Regions:
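Bacterial Sec-dependent N-terminal signal peptides
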Residues: 1-22
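Extracellular carbohydrate-recognition regions
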Residues: 21-40
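Secretory/extracellular carbohydrate-interaction modules
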Residues: 58-130
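Beta-strand-rich interaction surfaces with strong enrichment in secreted/lumenal proteins
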Residues: 72-79, 140-147, 187
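Short tryptophan-centered beta-strand motifs in secreted/extracellular beta-sheet-rich domains
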Residues: 87-89, 146-160, 164-166
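Short, aromatic/His-centered strand-loop micro-motif at the edge of beta-sheets
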Residues: 132-154
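Short, solvent-exposed beta-strand-to-loop segments that form ligand-recognition rims
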Residues: 167-187
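Ligand-recognition surfaces built from glycine- and aromatic
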Residues: 182-205
Length: 205
């Protein structure tokens, strides 16, 4: 009886472990079919195993949907967001100052329907956009060291039961409750005459 009980525990543990999927994208093969973009405002393209975003515009009074749609890339990830997820990636950017901003896009349906996490100035922002209009937002003071030639960031997004936490270099940038995420669309954007390299996207789902 004892052996049967131990066997059952082992089976349950293995089942629970196998239910968690871990996948990784390094951009070498573009296996997740990321969009690439080139225009006067900038470029989003894969080079040397990273997704590079180059913004050439710092136009004032720009709307969020214009910003997200100008220099951005997205993919539909191999995961079910309803199960919750732990997503990690790295970002390397040149001097972060002035009007420069960058971030990630979650719950992406199209450029006018998504959730945008943005680092700009001394704050981290989260915007919920629907039909091109901001229908919800949250911010938190979050300072990056400015003036360095290159800044390397480890970004982590943890979503579970409607609660969203975003950490940068293991420091909490935002904690948001009651944030429904139903789409597996995910992406990056940059704005304000800057260059950002994204790499090592890893998902635990």
């Amino acid at each position: 009886m004892k052996k049967k009980f131990l066997f059952l525990i082992t089976v349950v543990a293995l089942t629970a472990t196998s239910a968690v999927a871990q996948v990784k994208e390094t951009f070498d093969s573009n296996s997740w079919q990321w969009t690439e973009y080139s225009a006067e405002l900038g470029r989003a393209y894969i080079i040397e195993g990273v997704m590079r975003l180059e913004s050439k515009s710092d136009k004032a009074n720009i709307t969020l949907d214009e910003m997200v749609g100008s220099v951005a890339t997205h993919s539909f990830l191999p995961m079910d967001p309803a199960k919750g997820f732990d997503l990690k990636c790295t970002a390397t950017l040149e001097k972060f100052e002035g009007k420069k901003s960058f971030g990630i896009i979650l719950d992406y349906i199209d450029d006018m329907n998504c959730i945008v996490f943005m680092i700009k100035g001394d704050c981290a922002w989260l915007y919920k956009m629907k039909e091109g209009k901001i229908v919800g937002q949250q911010k938190n003071q979050f300072k990056l060291q400015k003036g360095k030639k290159n800044t390397s960031l480890d970004i982590q997004v943890v979503y579970q039961g409607g609660e969203l936490e975003i950490r940068v270099n293991d420091v909490q940038a935002l904690l948001c409750k009651y944030v429904p995420i139903t789409s597996n669309g995910f992406g990056f954007f940059a704005f304000g005459k800057c260059k950002v390299d994204f790499d090592d996207v890893e998902i635990l789902n």
